[in-house]
From Swiss-Prot:
Membrane topology category: Peripheral membrane protein
Main location (coarse class): mitochondrion
InterPro entries reported in the protein's UniProt record: COA8
Name of this protein: Cytochrome c oxidase assembly factor 8
Protein family membership: Belongs to the COA8 family.
Transit peptide as recorded in UniProt: 1-26
Record's keyword annotation contains Transit peptide: yes
Free-text description of this protein's post-translational modifications in UniProt: N-terminal mitochondrial targeting sequence is cleaved from the mature protein once in the mitochondrion.
Source organism (scientific name): Rattus norvegicus
Induction (free text): In conditions of increased oxidative stress, the protein is stabilized, increasing its mature intramitochondrial form and thereby protecting COX from oxidatively induced degradation.
């Protein structure tokens, strides 16, 4: 296996591949694509290789979140590496949660609209050929039910989100102290003369 050194082509390809989508899909594969949305990767966006900053990509089509492409510095300390990895893990966890949640929401919303239209005796299309919709009051029932049904899931998500962010903040503080300490150690000592 090629060495994954910062700046190496192998690392760049690996990073770009890990942040790329599944590529062009045929129409018959759309159902599979929707099923696999929970495990989807982010867009094909890849920052320039000479970049020395984190980049924010375009929104993911399933989670609607913008992925962050983290810069890997050449002289990254073990603590900085752990912080970056923790941030990447949190981002992937967040992407997966919202991709699953949005897929579930859209599916249940379509089923709700379809069942309500059938109960009214309407079809999925109006006489003019446009897609039939429900009014805001009818949709409010769906939103209320969906939120009630997913309350526990959202509570667990929020709890985990806060835990992860506190851990990231803690590591950011440690990294800041480590950097400050290394700068203090590098300063030349003044001699009295």
């Amino acid at each position: 296996m090629a060495a994954l050194r910062p700046g190496s082509k192998a690392l760049r390809r690996l990073l770009c591949r890990s942040f790329s989508g599944g590529g062009v899909r045929l129409a018959r594969e759309r159902a599979t694509e929707r099923r696999d949305a929970a495990s989807s990767r982010v867009s094909r966006f890849c920052p320039p290789r000479q970049s020395c900053h984190d980049w924010i990509g375009p929104p993911d089509k399933y989670s609607n979140l913008r992925p962050v492409h983290f810069h890997v510095p050449e002289n990254e300390s073990p603590l900085e590496q752990r912080l970056r990895e923790l941030r990447q893990e949190t981002q992937e966890w967040n992407q997966q949660f919202w991709a699953k949640q949005n897929l579930s929401f859209n599916k249940e919303k379509e089923e709700f609209i379809y069942s309500r239209l059938q109960a009214k005796g309407s079809g999925p299309r109006t006489e003019s050929g446009q897609r039939a919709t429900l009014d805001a009051e009818e949709m409010a029932d769906f939103y209320k039910d969906f939120l009630s049904k997913n309350f526990q899931k959202h509570m667990c998500y929020n709890r985990d989100w806060y835990k992860r962010n506190f851990a990231i903040t803690f590591f950011m503080g440690k990294v800041a102290l480590e950097r400050m300490w290394s700068k203090l150690k590098q300063k030349p000592k003044k001699t009295s003369g």
